[in-house]
Amino acid sequence: MPSVMEKSHGSSAVISRNRAKSDSLGNSEEESSEDEAPRDSMIRVGSDYQAQIPECKPDNTSPSGNVELKGMLVWSPSQFVSDAKLNEYITMAKEKHGYNVEQSLGMLLWHKHDVERSLADLANFTPFPEEWSVEDKVLFEQAFSFHGKSFQRIQQMLPEKLIPSLVKYYYSWKKTRSRTSVMDRQARRLQAKREEGMEEVEDQIKMSDNETDVTETKKEAPVPQKVVSGAVSGKTGPVRKEPLISQYRHHPLRSRQRPPKGIHLNKSDVSAVCASSEMPAIALCQLETQLISLKRQVQNIKQMNSSLKESLEGGISEMRPPELNIKLNARWTTDEQLLAVQAVRKYGKDFQAISEVLGNKTPSQVKTFFISYRRRFNLEEVLQEWEAEQEPSPPPASTDMSNKTSGSSQTPNEEDDEVQITSVSSSSQPAPPAAAAAASLSLPPPLLRPAIPCAPTLHRQPPPLQPGRLLQPRPPPLVRPAPRQSPRAPPALVGSHAESTFS
């Protein structure tokens, strides 16, 4: 028991000590707060409580973070530099050195509007590249679509850009937004016109529906009976109708009913329709018949197009001409020889064209034919005729004179070489007229020999491979003209025709 009492007495002593310490601490805090309270509330007056202000130094610029925001003069126009010279300087600085307009003008202002010095100094500096990259521009557009003109929020998406640069780029970007191509403008106009036309049609449909509803209600409503009594209306005599309040009171132009898009009213047509009560029905019948005929034409054209498309689906292999397997042959048949002579008469020495006409001969084979058969088919004269056709034809008077001179200049050697069959006086032969001479000198059709002039029946015509001359008419072959100096007795083959010439 005494031990327990001692323990309890010791514990109570400890508790009392702790309580005493806490009371002493609380009292000290209260005293300190009471001491501080009068100190805070006192008025501080005197030199001890005043701030020491340094002297003003206007020349020294205080370092601050807003130095970049200060403006700097970039360009000031001067009367010593003309506009043409200034434009030339700007283009040269842009093309050669890559300066923009602002940088080039700043350089010119730095050199006090001396163009030559500024041009010489442009190569010593490298201009800043474009500050706004493609990514920056895209980010700016997105930020502007989100935040509008709140440039502080836009700067949060573009932290490396200053607000003045954002504002500057905004105004330059705003100008480019209004630039649209001509095609876009035209598309917008057409879209607006279509929308207006659709709105007009819808308004007319609504108006027509309203009119039909009004007519139906009028038909359904019973006809009121006339009641003659003073209690119905307080006024006697004609009653003035109250004007209906228009739906488009503020817009009187909209109250006008316009025809649908594409329909225009013509005064003559309206007067013709209003002439009689049957004219509208007749006009509608005519328009319906025209519409039916046009629909038939459209249907026929569609059927034709569908049939043509079906025929094209199979391809065009059936329409192609069959390929001829022509084999080259070195042998010349009679028909090929005659065709080659006519081709020489048509194309001259164009062996490629002649080979294409023949089909189974090469140009080299045609050339060898021309060389080997030159004398047999008289190809030199045929070639001369072709050359004469290529040259411009002389006038008819000169051709007549050449015919006379050629007829008189025949040599006796040519007369001796020919074989005499009959003698015919030159006076008995009638002179050909000018029209016949012109017809004989006309150009022949392609691949055909020229027409032979009319001659007596006893005279033989030359073979088809030896065409007659065009420029110098000569007597037919194997016929010799009779000599004029010593006329001889006619042979028995001529008969009475020769006797009449010498009588």
Curated annotation (Swiss-Prot):
PROSITE patterns the record matches: ELM2, SANT
Region of interest called Disordered, as start-end residue ranges on this chain: 1-62, 385-503
Gene Ontology BP terms: negative regulation of DNA-templated transcription; regulation of transcription by RNA polymerase II
Chief place where the protein resides: nucleus
A GO MF term: transcription corepressor activity
Annotated compartments: Nucleus
SUPFAM superfamilies, per database record: Homeodomain-like (SSF46689)
Keyword terms of this UniProt record: Coiled coil, Nucleus, Repeat, Repressor, Transcription, Transcription regulation
GO cellular component terms listed in the entry, alphabetical order: histone deacetylase complex; nucleus; transcription regulator complex
Signal peptide start and end residues: none
Coiled-coil segments on the chain, per record: 182-206, 286-314
Residues of the SANT domain: 127-178, 327-378
Start-end of Low complexity biased regions: 423-442
Disulfide topology: none
Polar residues bias spans: 399-412
Keyword Transcription regulation: yes
ELM2 domain sequence ranges: 41-126
Keyword Transit peptide part of the UniProt annotation: no
UniProt record similarity statement: Belongs to the CoREST family.
Record's function text: May act as a component of a corepressor complex that represses transcription.
Annotated protein name in UniProt: REST corepressor 2
